[in-house]
């Protein structure tokens, strides 16, 4: 669902860039990137700030996982005791909570058995790649002081940074090894 961002006011920030001004109220929505936003306005803010085109998937928080029953897939045990799940080659893509697209639910179950992991099913269909092309421009950083506004981003270190300024300062400090994981809290 496309969010009408024109209903939220804009202002010019200290860097001279247009910025969406959001109310403090909490009306959680789930974006098509699988991230929960505090308000439709915050989704508009991130789209403007980072040049993305994320839409609203639904009202309320994003669901963590969708139930899946791996016991329904046939399996075999080899002589050395290794269990293998037997999957078809059907393409009925599912997105794992690890951000990887699996050919079908059975292949996700098989991955967990082989790797000894417990990756859940985030949703049916391919994982969305909205964030794959998103990079944060930190060329104007580091800055000696950052504003106190709370517009969280999650870094590749699984740490929540309160805003772009704090995140970019950390990127510079990491010599560029820190990247954007997703918008919102980790």
UniProtKB/Swiss-Prot annotation:
Compartments, as annotated in UniProt: Secreted
Residue pairs linked by disulfide bridges in the UniProt entry: 5-44, 22-41, 30-62, 70-109, 87-106, 95-127, 138-168, 146-165, 154-186
Task: Kindly give the SUPFAM superfamilies that the UniProt entry links to this protein.
Answer: Kazal-type serine protease inhibitors (SSF100895)
A single cellular component GO annotation: extracellular region
Report the glycosylation sites.
10, 53, 75, 175
Major location category of this protein: secreted
The protein's matches in Gene3D superfamilies, at most eight in alphabetical order, are given as:
3.30.60.30
Q: Which CDD domains match?
A: KAZAL_FS
Site positions for Reactive bond 2 for trypsin: 89-90
Q: Where is the Kazal-like domain?
A: 1-64, 65-129, 132-186
A GO MF annotation of the entry reads: serine-type endopeptidase inhibitor activity
Does the record's keyword annotation contain Glycoprotein?
A: yes
What are the record keywords, sorted? Disulfide bond, Glycoprotein, Protease inhibitor, Repeat, Secreted, Serine protease inhibitor
Q: Where is this site: Reactive bond 3 for trypsin?
A: 148-149
One Pfam family from the UniProt entry? Kazal_1
Q: What information about domains appears in the record's comments?
A: Avian ovomucoid consists of three homologous, tandem Kazal family inhibitory domains. The first domain does not inhibit any tested protease. Domains 2 and 3 inhibit trypsin.
Protein name, please?
Answer: Ovomucoid
Q: Which organism is it from?
A: Coturnix japonica
């Amino acid at each position: 669902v496309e969010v009408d961002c024109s209903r939220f006011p804009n202002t010019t920030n200290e860097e001279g860039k247009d910025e969406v001004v959001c109310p403090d109220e909490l009306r959680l929505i789930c974006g098509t990137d699988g991230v929960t936003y505090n308000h439709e306005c915050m989704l508009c803010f991130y789209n403007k700030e980072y040049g993305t085109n994320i839409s609203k998937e639904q009202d309320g928080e994003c669901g963590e996982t969708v139930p899946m029953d791996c016991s329904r897939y046939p399996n075999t045990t080899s002589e050395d005791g290794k269990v293998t799940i037997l999957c078809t080659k059907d393409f009925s893509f599912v997105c794992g909570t690890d951000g990887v697209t699996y050919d079908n639910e059975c292949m996700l179950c098989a991955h967990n058995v082989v790797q000894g992991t417990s990756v859940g099913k985030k949703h049916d269909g391919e994982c969305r790649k909205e964030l794959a092309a998103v990079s944060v421009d930190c060329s104007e950083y580091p800055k000696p002081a950052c504003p106190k506004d709370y517009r969280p981003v999650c870094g590749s270190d699984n740490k929540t940074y309160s805003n772009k300024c704090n995140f970019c300062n950390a990127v510079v400090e990491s010599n560029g090894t820190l990247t954007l994981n997703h918008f919102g809290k980790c």
